Amino acid sequence: MKSKTSSFPFCLVMFKKLVLLNQLSRQLVKQLLQEWSIMKLWVTLLPEFTNF
């Protein structure tokens, strides 16, 4: 029983780290998606500008 209680904080720490990682990856994905949409916007707008 004693070993179980000592491993509990470790699990908690790991869980917190996982949650943090999850949040970070979500932010990264959001950023990448925004940059990708900006790129697509540029690609669609550039021909319009070059037509002039």
UniProtKB/Swiss-Prot annotation:
Organism, as annotated: Saccharomyces cerevisiae (strain ATCC 204508 / S288c) (Baker's yeast)
Name listed for the protein in its UniProt record: Uncharacterized protein YBR121C-A
